[in-house]
Amino acid sequence: GGTELGRLVRAMLLGDGPVPTSRAEALLFAADRAQHTDEVVEPTLRAGRHVVTDRSYGSTLAYQGHGRGQSVEQLMALVDFATAGILPDLIVLLDVPLDMADVRLGGERDRLESEAAEFGQRVRDGFFQLAGADPDRWVIVDGVGDVDDVAARVWETYEGWR
């Protein structure tokens, strides 16, 4: 998270400490999202500026919903509460095959990144289902290639969107 509380919550959730239940995990991530919305997103939007962030509600739906088997509908209600209804106008989903993502992660992995391959596949499938269900908000960009190529594709996508 981009807040002090968010950093603490994420360290607790993704570190070596006690493993939360699936529902507790979703609630803790929602607390992080609520704090981030209140401290970062809402004030930035109120100031008339854009917000660019690396995670959004799609992560909750993909990881806790599709990955953990929690109700996507219930999670969306939780997201709506946590974000006070403030959702992104554009979500860029970088399409990277799981084996390539695994190589890019290298040796340092958090608890979620260390899950079994089946979990990763469910999460990936979940992201694509979300993108397919809301094509006005989600754009899929090829994430294969070096960082400059991928960044150029993301920028081109943004330019075409705005």
For the regions a protein language model found, what residue spans apply to each?
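ATP-dependent small-molecule kinase phosphotransfer cores
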Residues: 1-83, 153
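Residues at helix-coil transition
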Residues: 14-15, 46, 93, 106, ...
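Short beta->alpha linker loops
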Residues: 32, 56, 96, 145-146
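A generic structural signal for alpha->beta connector loops
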Residues: 48-49, 88, 135-138
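Hydrophobic/aromatic beta-strand patches that form the interior of the parallel beta-sheet core
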Residues: 52, 90-92, 139-141
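A glycine- and Lys/Arg-enriched "phosphate-lid" helix/loop adjacent to the NTP-binding pocket
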Residues: 59-126
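NTP-dependent small-molecule kinase module
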Residues: 99-162
